[in-house]
């Protein structure tokens, strides 16, 4: 039995949207009203990240992004039937979707910076994450989202050569003309009409270099902060009580999951899609299923926080079983208040 990847993509996206709607809404409610130890800037960061995840999932449902790899090209287009008559609108949704993806990754990097400062220097944390200075981090997230969106719009906007390159392939596979759908096209090489030589298309190189640079920047931040925190945390744990050591281990486990899950599910699979055209293999693949996996990230991140962090588990128990269920919120002692006052735990 042949699996229809487009139908499977739709099913995954719908499941992810409903899951994100439930998980992220619950996370926002618990963070705002139920948790006891999550305060300060990080409280708002969790809420904003959950909201951004919801917007990402909603945009995915409207745009229905899909990708097709064909020889020296990949095609980023929409499978949306509901908005098919509004081609320009769907194009903007595709651009927005790519930008939101970049913003989500950048937001995770900001959380790593925050947690790193929590352990290194509380005064440094106050200098960078209080008052109007929080606006800087908002612009940080927006900047990288805009940069990714701009690279898609300006570098992949189809021209005559790219249209003609994938026209027959697109018609054969999807039974629709490329002129009728919201579409962006990367063609790595262009054949010179007289010499028959293949030359790199500058716009394609700029797009790939730009998007990979964004990922490298965010991952460098996360890896540096994560490794530094791990080294310093081991030393600091010696002075903590057993309860606080357990809390710190939960904290570090959350970090590991937040960086490893998107790496395995989203970032590793996307590299063959992005770089494949530059190898100019003879290939025809409906690789858009990867974009459906992207939509799973918002609910997964929410589930990680709510299942790993004790404060959320207690809040969930009280919410569904009542306040007399026996769950108790741990009191953070004075010995670690300077560290945990601004942190997730």
Swiss-Prot record:
Main subcellular location of this protein, as a coarse class: membrane
Molecular-function GO terms, alphabetical: G protein-coupled receptor activity
Keyword Secreted: no
Stretches assigned to the Cytoplasmic side: 33-37, 114-133, 226-258, 310-345
Keyword Lyase assigned: no
Topological domain spans for side Extracellular: 1-11, 59-92, 155-204, 280-288
Topological type in the membrane: Multi-pass membrane protein
Subcellular localization, as worded in the UniProt entry: Cell membrane
Glycosylation sites: 71
Keywords (A to Z) from UniProt: Cell membrane, G-protein coupled receptor, Glycoprotein, Membrane, Receptor, Transducer, Transmembrane, Transmembrane helix
Tissue expression remark: Detected in ALM and PLM mechanosensory neurons and head neurons.
InterPro entries documented for this protein: 7TM_GPCR_serpentine_rcpt_Str (IPR019428)
Function: Regulates egg-laying and locomotion. Likely to act upstream of goa-1 to suppress 5-hydroxytryptamine (5-HT) biosynthesis in hermaphrodite-specific neurons (HSNs) through inhibition of tph-1 transcription.
Name by which UniProt lists this protein: G-protein coupled receptor str-33
Native source organism of the sequence: Caenorhabditis elegans
Gene name in the database record: str-33
């Amino acid at each position: 039995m042949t699996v229809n990847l487009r139908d499977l993509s739709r099913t995954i996206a719908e499941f992810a949207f409903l899951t994100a709607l439930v998980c992220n809404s619950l996370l926002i409610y618990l963070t705002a009203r139920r948790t006891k130890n999550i305060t300060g800037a990080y409280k708002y960061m969790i809420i904003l990240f959950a909201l951004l995840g919801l917007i990402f999932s909603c945009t995915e449902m409207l745009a229905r992004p899909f990708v097709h790899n064909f020889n020296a090209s990949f095609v980023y287009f929409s499978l949306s039937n509901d908005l098919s008559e509004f081609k320009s609108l769907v194009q903007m949704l595709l651009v927005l979707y790519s930008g939101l993806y970049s913003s989500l990754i950048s937001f995770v990097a900001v959380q790593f910076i925050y947690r790193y400062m929590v352990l290194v220097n509380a005064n440094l944390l106050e200098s960078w994450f209080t008052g109007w200075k929080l606006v800087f981090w908002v612009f940080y997230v927006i900047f990288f989202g805009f940069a990714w969106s701009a690279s898609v719009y300006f570098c992949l906007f189809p021209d005559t050569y790219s249209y003609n390159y994938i026209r027959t392939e697109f018609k054969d596979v999807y039974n629709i003309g490329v002129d009728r759908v919201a579409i962006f096209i990367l063609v790595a090489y262009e054949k010179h009409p007289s010499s028959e030589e293949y030359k790199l298309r500058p716009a394609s190189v700029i797009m790939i270099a730009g998007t990979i640079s964004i990922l490298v920047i965010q991952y460098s931040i996360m890896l540096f902060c994560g490794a530094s925190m791990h080294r310093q945390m081991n030393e600091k744990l010696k002075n903590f009580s057993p309860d606080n050591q357990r809390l710190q281990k939960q904290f570090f486990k959350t970090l590991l999951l937040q960086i490893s899950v998107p790496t395995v599910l989203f970032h590793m699979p996307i590299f063959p899609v992005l770089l494949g055209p530059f190898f100019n293999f003879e290939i025809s693949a409906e690789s858009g299923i990867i974009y459906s996996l992207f939509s799973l990230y918002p609910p997964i991140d929410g589930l990680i926080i709510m299942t790993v962090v004790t404060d959320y588990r207690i809040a969930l128990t009280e919410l569904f079983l009542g306040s007399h269920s026996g769950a108790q919120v741990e009191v953070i002692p004075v010995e670690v208040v300077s560290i945990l006052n601004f942190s997730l735990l």
